[in-house]
Structures are given as structure tokens and as C-alpha cells.
């Protein structure tokens, strides 16, 4: 948003750039930033006249569609992610009926020595539903997903970082790149479909030599 403001105020010109880098394209898509990125792309030279690099952890149909729009004769490079889990994280699994999952989550939040906990769900609607339930029941909770305006999202992230709220609910894409000290627990309310997403999730705890707990 700030870059667009500078361009529109004639403080910055993008029409002569040679390189355009679009990082975390899937996250930009999930967080609702693509309209802003499209405006920036329109300010830059045509794709045939610039070199564009686009990075993404996942390549959904929507991400590939963006690549077709923005890249000229692209070369694809795929890197296999490391799938090892952190030995400092204790991993637990509870077999429970779907109808009992929320009750079990409440027991975990009550009984575990939680400093901060990140709860992951696969879809934005699941994040919203879980957030509404926990907030209704009096928990100090924030959520991170693409449906939230950026200013509110940053405010919620600050509340989690400074400990004002000790529960964060997030999707995989929205939670990527979030590094918060003092996360003692990670809860997979819904298990991810990809193993590397699982590794990434539980990597939010057990950092810098500390012990962590992952519960699925």
C-alpha cells in the first residue's frame, strides 16, 4: 500500500525497473494482497521487458494463473523442503471424534502449562468458527487469516507477541513466516494435508533451544 501511494504521488517511478520479485505468492493470494500487487505490476514495464521472479511454497491453480499473467517464458525451479521435525518438540496425538474436538481443546487450554499457543486449521472458515467459539467462551484469542484487514491483522499479531492475548488461530499460509518468542504449544485442530506443512506448524515452538509441545 505504501509503495502504491508513493507511485501515485509521483515520489517513485517503476516504469524503468529491470527486475520484479514477487515473494510468497500463495500467501499474498490468501491474505488478499493480489489486487495491490496487480497495481504494482501495471506500473512496471511489460513482462517481456523485465525479469520477473516469483516464489511460492505451494503451486495451486490460482498461483499458476498468476505466473502465466506476470512471467515471460518462465523457467520453473522446485526445491524439496526439509521434512525433519524438531527434536526439541514433544509430539502428541489424540484420537477423538469430530464432535468432541472443541471440548478436548478446552481441556488442553485448561490443563497444559501454556505460555502462548498457536492453533492451526486448514481453512479460513474453520479459523473464524474456532475464533468465535473461543472468544465467546472468554479466552484471550486472536486470529490470522486472509479475510482480516491488514491493520487489524498487525494489531492482533502485536497483541499475541506482547502476551496480551496468548492464543492465536491461523491458517498455514497466514501463519507462514510468523516468528514469535515464547510459543510453548502448537495445536493442530485440523491436520494439514501436506507433511511439510506439519513440519512448519510445529516449528513455531521449541525454538532457540527451548522445549515445545505439539498436539494433534
PLM regions: where:
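Conserved helicase RecA-like core
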Residues: 1-216
